[in-house]
Protein backbone atom coordinates (compact mmCIF):
# COMPACT_ATOMS: atom_id res chain seq x y z
CA UNK A 1 0.00 0.00 0.00
CA UNK A 2 1.59 3.34 -1.00
CA UNK A 3 2.42 5.88 1.70
CA UNK A 4 0.63 9.16 2.15
CA UNK A 5 1.98 11.78 -0.22
CA UNK A 6 -0.60 14.54 -0.43
CA UNK A 7 -0.82 17.85 1.40
CA UNK A 8 -0.43 16.28 4.80
CA UNK A 9 2.61 14.12 5.39
CA UNK A 10 2.11 10.58 6.65
CA UNK A 11 2.65 9.95 10.35
CA UNK A 12 3.67 6.36 9.80
CA UNK A 13 0.16 5.07 9.18
CA UNK A 14 -0.38 4.08 5.55
CA UNK A 15 -3.13 5.89 3.78
CA UNK A 16 -5.67 4.00 1.70
CA UNK A 17 -5.23 5.20 -1.86
CA UNK A 18 -7.08 3.99 -4.92
CA UNK A 19 -4.60 1.94 -6.98
CA UNK A 20 -4.39 2.43 -10.71
CA UNK A 21 -4.77 6.19 -10.56
CA UNK A 22 -1.25 7.20 -9.56
CA UNK A 23 0.23 7.93 -13.00
CA UNK A 24 -2.79 9.76 -14.37
CA UNK A 25 -3.20 11.68 -11.15
CA UNK A 26 0.47 12.61 -11.09
CA UNK A 27 0.41 13.88 -14.67
CA UNK A 28 -2.77 15.84 -14.03
CA UNK A 29 -1.36 17.37 -10.88
CA UNK A 30 1.86 18.30 -12.69
CA UNK A 31 -0.16 20.10 -15.34
CA UNK A 32 -2.09 21.92 -12.64
CA UNK A 33 1.16 22.96 -10.94
CA UNK A 34 2.45 24.33 -14.26
CA UNK A 35 -0.64 26.49 -14.63
CA UNK A 36 -0.24 27.60 -11.03
CA UNK A 37 3.38 28.61 -11.58
CA UNK A 38 2.43 30.65 -14.63
CA UNK A 39 -0.23 32.58 -12.73
CA UNK A 40 1.66 33.20 -9.48
CA UNK A 41 4.13 35.80 -10.70
CA UNK A 42 2.68 38.43 -8.36
CA UNK A 43 3.06 36.30 -5.25
CA UNK A 44 3.96 38.28 -2.15
CA UNK A 45 6.25 36.48 0.26
CA UNK A 46 6.33 38.03 3.74
CA UNK A 47 9.50 37.76 5.72
CA UNK A 48 9.34 34.56 7.73
CA UNK A 49 9.36 35.38 11.45
CA UNK A 50 12.00 33.81 13.63
CA UNK A 51 11.08 31.31 16.34
CA UNK A 52 11.11 34.02 18.98
CA UNK A 53 8.89 36.41 17.03
CA UNK A 54 6.22 34.08 15.73
CA UNK A 55 2.69 35.50 15.98
CA UNK A 56 -0.15 34.06 18.00
CA UNK A 57 -3.12 32.67 16.06
CA UNK A 58 -6.79 32.95 17.02
CA UNK A 59 -9.05 31.09 14.57
CA UNK A 60 -12.80 31.57 15.04
CA UNK A 61 -15.39 29.58 13.09
CA UNK A 62 -18.99 30.72 13.05
CA UNK A 63 -20.57 27.38 12.28
CA UNK A 64 -23.32 27.70 9.62
CA UNK A 65 -22.79 31.41 8.84
CA UNK A 66 -23.48 32.31 5.20
CA UNK A 67 -21.71 35.36 3.84
CA UNK A 68 -24.64 37.01 2.09
CA UNK A 69 -26.50 37.46 5.40
CA UNK A 70 -23.73 39.60 6.90
CA UNK A 71 -24.00 43.35 6.37
CA UNK A 72 -20.20 43.29 5.98
CA UNK A 73 -20.98 41.72 2.59
CA UNK A 74 -23.81 44.09 1.70
CA UNK A 75 -26.79 42.50 3.45
CA UNK A 76 -29.66 44.90 4.15
CA UNK A 77 -30.11 43.96 7.80
CA UNK A 78 -27.39 45.07 10.20
CA UNK A 79 -26.44 41.62 11.43
CA UNK A 80 -22.73 42.26 12.03
CA UNK A 81 -22.14 45.86 13.15
CA UNK A 82 -19.07 45.01 15.23
CA UNK A 83 -17.52 42.78 12.58
CA UNK A 84 -18.07 45.45 9.93
CA UNK A 85 -16.18 48.01 12.03
CA UNK A 86 -13.43 45.69 13.27
CA UNK A 87 -12.71 44.28 9.82
CA UNK A 88 -11.74 47.72 8.49
CA UNK A 89 -8.27 46.85 9.79
CA UNK A 90 -8.34 43.37 8.24
CA UNK A 91 -8.32 41.69 4.83
CA UNK A 92 -11.90 40.84 3.88
CA UNK A 93 -12.28 38.16 1.21
CA UNK A 94 -15.44 38.91 -0.72
CA UNK A 95 -15.60 35.63 -2.65
CA UNK A 96 -14.67 32.79 -0.30
CA UNK A 97 -16.09 29.30 -0.68
CA UNK A 98 -16.03 26.25 1.53
CA UNK A 99 -15.01 22.94 -0.02
CA UNK A 100 -18.20 21.30 1.30
CA UNK A 101 -21.58 22.21 2.72
CA UNK A 102 -21.43 20.57 6.13
CA UNK A 103 -19.20 20.32 9.19
CA UNK A 104 -17.17 17.13 8.90
CA UNK A 105 -15.56 17.50 5.46
CA UNK A 106 -15.21 21.26 5.69
CA UNK A 107 -13.39 21.23 9.03
CA UNK A 108 -11.21 18.32 7.97
CA UNK A 109 -10.25 20.25 4.84
CA UNK A 110 -9.40 23.42 6.76
CA UNK A 111 -7.30 21.38 9.18
CA UNK A 112 -5.38 19.47 6.47
CA UNK A 113 -5.47 21.55 3.27
CA UNK A 114 -7.08 18.62 1.47
CA UNK A 115 -10.34 18.15 -0.40
CA UNK A 116 -13.00 15.83 1.09
CA UNK A 117 -12.25 13.16 -1.51
CA UNK A 118 -8.63 13.25 -0.32
CA UNK A 119 -9.24 12.85 3.42
CA UNK A 120 -12.47 10.77 3.30
CA UNK A 121 -14.01 12.41 6.37
CA UNK A 122 -17.75 12.71 5.77
CA UNK A 123 -21.20 11.51 6.85
CA UNK A 124 -20.22 7.89 6.26
CA UNK A 125 -16.85 8.13 8.01
CA UNK A 126 -16.88 10.67 10.84
CA UNK A 127 -13.25 10.21 11.87
CA UNK A 128 -10.27 12.20 10.56
CA UNK A 129 -7.63 9.53 10.09
CA UNK A 130 -4.37 9.66 12.03
CA UNK A 131 -2.52 9.49 8.71
CA UNK A 132 -3.17 13.16 8.11
CA UNK A 133 -1.04 15.82 9.73
CA UNK A 134 -3.24 18.65 10.93
CA UNK A 135 -2.39 22.32 11.10
CA UNK A 136 -2.49 22.12 14.90
CA UNK A 137 0.16 19.40 14.85
CA UNK A 138 2.40 21.57 12.69
CA UNK A 139 1.99 24.56 15.01
CA UNK A 140 2.60 22.37 18.06
CA UNK A 141 5.70 20.95 16.40
CA UNK A 142 6.95 24.50 15.86
CA UNK A 143 6.76 25.25 19.59
CA UNK A 144 3.23 26.59 19.94
CA UNK A 145 0.83 25.81 22.78
CA UNK A 146 -2.50 24.74 21.27
CA UNK A 147 -6.12 24.97 22.45
CA UNK A 148 -9.48 24.05 20.92
CA UNK A 149 -12.97 24.90 22.14
CA UNK A 150 -15.86 23.66 20.03
CA UNK A 151 -19.61 23.62 20.51
CA UNK A 152 -19.88 21.20 17.60
CA UNK A 153 -19.62 17.66 19.02
CA UNK A 154 -18.00 16.33 15.86
CA UNK A 155 -14.99 18.62 16.37
CA UNK A 156 -14.67 18.36 20.14
CA UNK A 157 -15.78 14.80 20.94
CA UNK A 158 -12.70 12.63 20.73
CA UNK A 159 -11.83 9.90 20.10
CA UNK A 160 -14.83 9.74 17.78
CA UNK A 161 -13.87 12.51 15.36
CA UNK A 162 -10.13 12.69 16.03
CA UNK A 163 -10.11 16.38 15.12
CA UNK A 164 -8.00 17.32 18.14
CA UNK A 165 -4.74 15.91 16.80
CA UNK A 166 -2.01 18.31 17.92
CA UNK A 167 -4.21 20.03 20.50
CA UNK A 168 -2.80 20.37 24.03
CA UNK A 169 -6.24 20.87 25.53
CA UNK A 170 -9.73 20.56 24.02
CA UNK A 171 -12.89 21.73 25.77
CA UNK A 172 -16.59 22.17 24.98
CA UNK A 173 -19.80 23.47 26.59
CA UNK A 174 -20.58 20.05 28.05
CA UNK A 175 -17.22 19.75 29.79
CA UNK A 176 -18.00 18.94 33.44
CA UNK A 177 -16.76 22.31 34.66
CA UNK A 178 -19.03 24.16 32.20
CA UNK A 179 -22.11 21.94 31.80
CA UNK A 180 -24.21 23.58 34.52
CA UNK A 181 -23.38 27.10 33.35
CA UNK A 182 -24.16 26.10 29.76
CA UNK A 183 -27.62 24.92 30.73
CA UNK A 184 -28.23 28.17 32.59
CA UNK A 185 -27.22 30.20 29.53
CA UNK A 186 -29.45 28.21 27.18
CA UNK A 187 -32.46 28.30 29.48
CA UNK A 188 -32.11 32.07 29.69
CA UNK A 189 -32.34 32.27 25.88
CA UNK A 190 -35.59 30.33 25.68
CA UNK A 191 -38.95 32.02 26.09
CA UNK A 192 -42.01 30.24 27.56
CA UNK A 193 -43.88 30.68 24.28
CA UNK A 194 -41.13 29.18 22.11
CA UNK A 195 -42.64 26.45 19.90
CA UNK A 196 -40.01 26.60 17.16
CA UNK A 197 -37.91 23.52 18.01
CA UNK A 198 -37.54 20.41 20.13
CA UNK A 199 -35.15 22.18 22.51
CA UNK A 200 -37.61 23.23 25.26
CA UNK A 201 -38.70 19.61 25.68
CA UNK A 202 -35.09 18.45 25.73
CA UNK A 203 -34.19 20.94 28.44
CA UNK A 204 -37.20 19.86 30.46
CA UNK A 205 -35.96 16.27 30.23
CA UNK A 206 -32.51 17.39 31.37
CA UNK A 207 -34.04 19.20 34.32
CA UNK A 208 -35.90 16.04 35.32
CA UNK A 209 -32.79 13.90 34.94
CA UNK A 210 -34.16 11.87 32.01
CA UNK A 211 -31.11 12.66 29.86
CA UNK A 212 -27.51 12.81 31.09
CA UNK A 213 -26.37 15.57 28.75
CA UNK A 214 -28.44 18.25 27.14
CA UNK A 215 -28.46 18.94 23.43
CA UNK A 216 -28.90 22.56 24.42
CA UNK A 217 -25.33 22.94 25.62
CA UNK A 218 -24.19 23.47 22.04
CA UNK A 219 -26.03 26.79 22.05
CA UNK A 220 -23.96 28.18 24.93
CA UNK A 221 -20.60 28.27 23.19
CA UNK A 222 -20.13 32.01 23.05
CA UNK A 223 -19.94 33.00 26.68
CA UNK A 224 -18.17 29.82 27.74
CA UNK A 225 -15.62 29.91 24.91
CA UNK A 226 -14.36 33.25 26.16
CA UNK A 227 -14.07 32.01 29.75
CA UNK A 228 -12.38 28.75 28.74
CA UNK A 229 -9.91 30.47 26.42
CA UNK A 230 -8.88 33.07 28.98
CA UNK A 231 -8.43 30.43 31.67
CA UNK A 232 -6.27 28.30 29.41
CA UNK A 233 -4.14 31.24 28.28
CA UNK A 234 -3.50 32.22 31.89
CA UNK A 235 -2.64 28.67 32.97
CA UNK A 236 -0.51 27.54 30.01
CA UNK A 237 3.10 28.41 29.21
CA UNK A 238 3.15 32.12 28.39
CA UNK A 239 6.66 31.80 26.97
CA UNK A 240 5.21 30.02 23.94
CA UNK A 241 3.04 31.62 21.25
CA UNK A 242 -0.50 30.26 21.13
CA UNK A 243 -2.71 28.63 18.50
CA UNK A 244 -6.40 28.77 19.49
CA UNK A 245 -9.32 27.36 17.50
CA UNK A 246 -12.92 28.18 18.48
CA UNK A 247 -16.18 26.88 16.99
CA UNK A 248 -19.45 28.70 17.76
CA UNK A 249 -22.86 27.10 17.06
CA UNK A 250 -25.26 29.99 17.65
CA UNK A 251 -26.21 30.20 13.94
CA UNK A 252 -26.81 26.45 13.65
CA UNK A 253 -30.33 25.17 13.96
CA UNK A 254 -32.13 25.20 16.38
CA UNK A 255 -32.14 28.99 16.15
CA UNK A 256 -32.62 30.42 19.65
CA UNK A 257 -31.14 33.94 19.63
CA UNK A 258 -32.11 35.87 22.78
CA UNK A 259 -35.09 38.17 22.49
CA UNK A 260 -32.95 41.33 22.61
CA UNK A 261 -31.31 40.43 19.29
CA UNK A 262 -34.64 39.66 17.64
CA UNK A 263 -35.95 43.01 18.83
CA UNK A 264 -33.12 44.83 17.04
CA UNK A 265 -34.20 43.38 13.68
CA UNK A 266 -37.94 42.71 13.94
CA UNK A 267 -41.13 44.49 14.89
CA UNK A 268 -42.71 43.47 18.22
CA UNK A 269 -45.36 41.52 16.33
CA UNK A 270 -42.78 39.61 14.30
CA UNK A 271 -40.68 38.91 17.39
CA UNK A 272 -43.68 37.15 18.92
CA UNK A 273 -44.41 35.28 15.68
CA UNK A 274 -40.79 34.16 15.32
CA UNK A 275 -41.24 31.84 18.31
CA UNK A 276 -44.24 30.12 16.72
CA UNK A 277 -42.81 28.92 13.38
CA UNK A 278 -42.34 25.15 13.66
CA UNK A 279 -38.74 24.50 12.67
CA UNK A 280 -38.48 21.05 14.21
CA UNK A 281 -36.29 18.65 12.30
CA UNK A 282 -39.25 16.66 11.05
CA UNK A 283 -40.91 19.72 9.56
CA UNK A 284 -37.73 21.07 7.99
CA UNK A 285 -36.85 17.74 6.37
CA UNK A 286 -40.37 17.38 5.01
CA UNK A 287 -40.12 20.84 3.49
CA UNK A 288 -36.73 20.07 1.91
CA UNK A 289 -38.11 16.83 0.45
CA UNK A 290 -41.19 18.58 -0.96
CA UNK A 291 -43.59 16.86 1.43
CA UNK A 292 -44.88 19.98 3.16
CA UNK A 293 -44.84 23.74 2.74
CA UNK A 294 -44.00 26.85 4.69
CA UNK A 295 -45.74 30.01 3.59
CA UNK A 296 -43.72 33.07 2.60
CA UNK A 297 -44.17 34.69 6.02
CA UNK A 298 -42.83 31.59 7.78
CA UNK A 299 -39.79 31.50 5.51
CA UNK A 300 -39.13 35.19 6.10
CA UNK A 301 -39.46 34.75 9.88
CA UNK A 302 -37.04 31.83 9.70
CA UNK A 303 -34.54 34.02 7.88
CA UNK A 304 -35.03 36.84 10.36
CA UNK A 305 -34.50 34.51 13.32
CA UNK A 306 -31.32 33.22 11.69
CA UNK A 307 -30.22 36.83 11.19
CA UNK A 308 -30.78 37.50 14.89
CA UNK A 309 -28.49 34.55 15.64
CA UNK A 310 -25.81 36.20 13.49
CA UNK A 311 -26.28 39.41 15.47
CA UNK A 312 -25.77 37.37 18.64
CA UNK A 313 -22.54 35.95 17.18
CA UNK A 314 -21.38 39.45 16.34
CA UNK A 315 -21.90 40.51 19.95
CA UNK A 316 -20.08 37.43 21.22
CA UNK A 317 -17.11 38.19 18.96
CA UNK A 318 -16.99 41.74 20.30
CA UNK A 319 -16.97 40.37 23.85
CA UNK A 320 -14.31 37.75 23.06
CA UNK A 321 -11.89 40.15 21.41
CA UNK A 322 -12.51 42.76 24.08
CA UNK A 323 -11.71 40.27 26.83
CA UNK A 324 -8.56 39.06 25.09
CA UNK A 325 -7.40 42.61 24.42
CA UNK A 326 -7.97 43.64 28.04
CA UNK A 327 -5.91 40.64 29.21
CA UNK A 328 -3.12 41.52 26.79
CA UNK A 329 -3.54 38.46 24.58
CA UNK A 330 -4.18 40.23 21.27
CA UNK A 331 -0.71 41.69 20.94
CA UNK A 332 0.92 40.29 17.81
CA UNK A 333 -2.02 37.96 17.23
CA UNK A 334 -3.39 36.92 13.84
CA UNK A 335 -7.18 36.63 14.00
CA UNK A 336 -9.20 34.60 11.50
CA UNK A 337 -12.98 34.72 11.25
CA UNK A 338 -14.67 32.29 8.88
CA UNK A 339 -17.41 29.64 8.67
CA UNK A 340 -17.38 25.96 7.85
CA UNK A 341 -20.46 26.31 5.63
CA UNK A 342 -23.61 28.35 5.18
CA UNK A 343 -27.32 27.56 5.41
CA UNK A 344 -30.24 27.04 3.04
CA UNK A 345 -33.07 29.35 4.10
CA UNK A 346 -35.79 28.44 1.64
CA UNK A 347 -33.76 28.80 -1.55
CA UNK A 348 -34.27 25.83 -3.91
CA UNK A 349 -37.05 24.76 -1.51
CA UNK A 350 -34.44 23.68 1.05
CA UNK A 351 -33.65 24.30 4.71
CA UNK A 352 -30.55 23.35 6.72
CA UNK A 353 -27.33 22.54 4.83
CA UNK A 354 -27.57 18.99 3.52
CA UNK A 355 -28.15 17.71 -0.03
CA UNK A 356 -26.68 20.90 -1.47
CA UNK A 357 -23.67 22.52 -3.07
CA UNK A 358 -25.52 25.75 -3.79
CA UNK A 359 -23.94 29.10 -2.94
CA UNK A 360 -26.15 29.41 0.15
CA UNK A 361 -24.11 26.66 1.81
CA UNK A 362 -20.74 27.22 0.11
CA UNK A 363 -20.18 30.99 0.21
CA UNK A 364 -18.92 31.98 3.65
CA UNK A 365 -17.23 34.93 5.38
CA UNK A 366 -13.45 34.99 5.53
CA UNK A 367 -11.59 37.76 7.34
CA UNK A 368 -7.86 37.76 8.07
CA UNK A 369 -6.61 40.26 10.66
CA UNK A 370 -2.82 40.49 10.71
CA UNK A 371 -1.63 44.10 11.02
CA UNK A 372 1.89 44.54 9.73
CA UNK A 373 1.67 41.25 7.89
CA UNK A 374 -1.43 41.52 5.71
CA UNK A 375 -2.73 44.71 4.10
CA UNK A 376 -6.25 45.70 5.14
CA UNK A 377 -9.01 46.06 2.57
CA UNK A 378 -11.39 44.02 0.46
CA UNK A 379 -10.12 41.23 -1.80
CA UNK A 380 -12.41 40.32 -4.70
CA UNK A 381 -10.37 37.48 -6.18
CA UNK A 382 -11.73 33.95 -5.54
CA UNK A 383 -10.42 31.98 -2.56
CA UNK A 384 -11.40 28.95 -0.47
CA UNK A 385 -11.48 28.33 3.26
CA UNK A 386 -8.93 25.51 3.16
CA UNK A 387 -6.46 28.11 1.85
CA UNK A 388 -6.06 29.00 5.53
CA UNK A 389 -3.89 25.89 5.93
CA UNK A 390 -0.91 27.13 3.86
CA UNK A 391 -1.57 30.79 4.69
CA UNK A 392 -1.32 30.49 8.46
CA UNK A 393 1.77 28.32 8.18
CA UNK A 394 3.33 30.93 5.92
CA UNK A 395 2.51 33.82 8.23
CA UNK A 396 3.96 31.93 11.19
CA UNK A 397 7.10 30.93 9.30
CA UNK A 398 6.33 27.22 9.61
CA UNK A 399 7.38 24.99 6.75
CA UNK A 400 4.93 22.60 5.16
CA UNK A 401 5.80 18.90 5.41
CA UNK A 402 8.43 17.75 2.88
CA UNK A 403 6.89 16.35 -0.28
CA UNK A 404 3.45 17.70 0.53
CA UNK A 405 1.17 18.95 -2.17
CA UNK A 406 -2.24 20.53 -2.14
CA UNK A 407 -4.76 22.48 -4.19
CA UNK A 408 -5.00 24.94 -1.29
CA UNK A 409 -3.30 28.25 -2.13
CA UNK A 410 -1.95 31.12 -0.08
CA UNK A 411 -4.48 33.85 0.67
CA UNK A 412 -1.62 36.33 0.35
CA UNK A 413 -1.69 36.07 -3.45
CA UNK A 414 -5.11 34.99 -4.76
CA UNK A 415 -5.49 34.12 -8.44
CA UNK A 416 -8.10 35.99 -10.46
CA UNK A 417 -8.62 33.04 -12.80
CA UNK A 418 -8.72 30.35 -10.14
CA UNK A 419 -10.88 27.31 -10.77
CA UNK A 420 -12.67 26.15 -7.62
CA UNK A 421 -14.11 22.78 -6.69
CA UNK A 422 -16.45 21.66 -3.91
CA UNK A 423 -18.33 18.47 -3.19
CA UNK A 424 -20.78 16.51 -1.11
CA UNK A 425 -18.98 13.17 -1.19
CA UNK A 426 -21.47 11.10 0.84
CA UNK A 427 -25.26 11.18 0.85
CA UNK A 428 -26.70 12.51 4.13
CA UNK A 429 -28.92 9.76 5.53
CA UNK A 430 -30.51 11.23 8.64
CA UNK A 431 -33.29 13.22 6.97
CA UNK A 432 -34.31 10.37 4.70
CA UNK A 433 -34.28 7.86 7.56
CA UNK A 434 -36.43 10.11 9.73
CA UNK A 435 -39.01 11.03 7.11
CA UNK A 436 -39.43 7.84 5.06
CA UNK A 437 -41.32 5.78 7.69
CA UNK A 438 -43.93 8.54 7.97
CA UNK A 439 -44.53 8.80 4.23
CA UNK A 440 -45.13 5.35 2.71
CA UNK A 441 -44.67 5.48 -1.03
CA UNK A 442 -42.37 8.49 -0.98
CA UNK A 443 -39.38 8.07 -3.29
CA UNK A 444 -36.21 9.53 -1.72
CA UNK A 445 -33.96 8.58 -4.65
CA UNK A 446 -33.59 12.20 -5.92
CA UNK A 447 -31.76 12.97 -2.67
CA UNK A 448 -29.60 9.84 -2.58
CA UNK A 449 -26.76 11.16 -4.66
CA UNK A 450 -23.26 12.58 -4.44
CA UNK A 451 -22.60 16.11 -5.66
CA UNK A 452 -19.60 17.94 -7.12
CA UNK A 453 -19.32 21.46 -8.42
CA UNK A 454 -16.77 23.38 -10.45
CA UNK A 455 -16.72 27.17 -10.68
CA UNK A 456 -14.83 28.90 -13.48
CA UNK A 457 -15.30 32.65 -13.44
CA UNK A 458 -19.04 33.23 -13.12
CA UNK A 459 -20.00 29.81 -14.50
CA UNK A 460 -20.92 27.08 -12.05
CA UNK A 461 -21.45 23.47 -13.07
CA UNK A 462 -23.03 20.99 -10.63
CA UNK A 463 -22.54 17.28 -11.21
CA UNK A 464 -24.95 14.76 -9.67
CA UNK A 465 -24.11 11.08 -9.38
CA UNK A 466 -27.65 10.29 -10.57
CA UNK A 467 -27.10 12.04 -13.90
CA UNK A 468 -28.98 15.21 -12.97
CA UNK A 469 -26.63 18.14 -13.53
CA UNK A 470 -27.00 21.92 -13.47
CA UNK A 471 -25.36 25.02 -14.93
CA UNK A 472 -25.64 28.55 -13.52
CA UNK A 473 -24.26 31.98 -14.36
CA UNK A 474 -23.54 33.40 -10.91
CA UNK A 475 -23.02 36.92 -12.23
CA UNK A 476 -26.52 37.10 -13.71
CA UNK A 477 -28.17 34.60 -11.37
CA UNK A 478 -26.43 34.66 -7.95
CA UNK A 479 -29.27 32.76 -6.26
CA UNK A 480 -29.09 29.90 -8.79
CA UNK A 481 -32.72 29.99 -9.86
CA UNK A 482 -32.29 29.29 -13.60
CA UNK A 483 -30.61 26.07 -14.69
CA UNK A 484 -29.04 26.81 -18.08
CA UNK A 485 -27.89 23.29 -18.87
CA UNK A 486 -30.50 22.88 -21.63
CA UNK A 487 -29.85 26.36 -23.00
CA UNK A 488 -26.05 26.06 -23.16
CA UNK A 489 -25.20 22.40 -23.80
CA UNK A 490 -21.74 23.16 -25.22
CA UNK A 491 -20.70 25.19 -22.18
CA UNK A 492 -22.12 22.51 -19.90
CA UNK A 493 -20.15 19.82 -21.73
CA UNK A 494 -16.94 21.86 -21.46
CA UNK A 495 -17.37 22.43 -17.73
CA UNK A 496 -18.25 18.78 -17.18
CA UNK A 497 -15.02 17.82 -18.92
CA UNK A 498 -13.08 20.40 -16.89
CA UNK A 499 -14.57 18.98 -13.70
CA UNK A 500 -13.51 15.46 -14.67
CA UNK A 501 -9.97 16.64 -15.35
CA UNK A 502 -9.81 18.59 -12.11
CA UNK A 503 -11.15 15.66 -10.11
CA UNK A 504 -8.44 13.49 -11.68
CA UNK A 505 -5.79 15.68 -10.03
CA UNK A 506 -7.04 14.81 -6.54
CA UNK A 507 -5.06 12.34 -4.48
CA UNK A 508 -8.20 10.39 -3.71
CA UNK A 509 -8.45 8.20 -0.67
CA UNK A 510 -10.41 5.02 -0.23
CA UNK A 511 -13.07 4.78 2.43
CA UNK A 512 -11.94 2.49 5.27
CA UNK A 513 -13.32 -1.04 5.07
CA UNK A 514 -14.90 -0.38 8.47
CA UNK A 515 -15.69 3.35 8.52
CA UNK A 516 -16.30 5.13 11.79
CA UNK A 517 -19.99 5.99 11.64
CA UNK A 518 -22.12 7.64 14.30
CA UNK A 519 -23.29 4.32 15.72
CA UNK A 520 -19.83 3.98 17.27
CA UNK A 521 -20.22 7.15 19.33
CA UNK A 522 -20.90 7.09 23.05
CA UNK A 523 -24.49 7.62 24.26
CA UNK A 524 -23.49 11.08 25.48
CA UNK A 525 -22.08 12.04 22.08
CA UNK A 526 -25.16 10.68 20.31
CA UNK A 527 -27.40 12.73 22.60
CA UNK A 528 -25.57 15.91 21.62
CA UNK A 529 -25.71 15.10 17.91
CA UNK A 530 -29.47 14.58 18.05
CA UNK A 531 -29.80 18.27 18.80
CA UNK A 532 -28.03 19.08 15.53
CA UNK A 533 -30.13 16.74 13.43
CA UNK A 534 -27.13 14.48 12.81
CA UNK A 535 -28.70 11.48 14.54
CA UNK A 536 -32.31 10.38 14.33
CA UNK A 537 -34.40 11.05 17.44
CA UNK A 538 -37.04 8.43 16.67
CA UNK A 539 -39.35 7.40 13.86
CA UNK A 540 -42.72 8.25 15.34
CA UNK A 541 -44.64 11.23 14.04
CA UNK A 542 -43.88 14.10 16.47
CA UNK A 543 -47.23 15.68 15.58
CA UNK A 544 -49.10 12.75 17.16
CA UNK A 545 -49.37 12.17 20.90
Locate each region found by the language model.
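Catalytic domains that recognize anionic headgroups
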Residues: 3, 36-545
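Bacterial N-terminal signal peptides that target proteins for export
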Residues: 4-27
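Bacterial N-terminal signal peptides
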Residues: 26-37
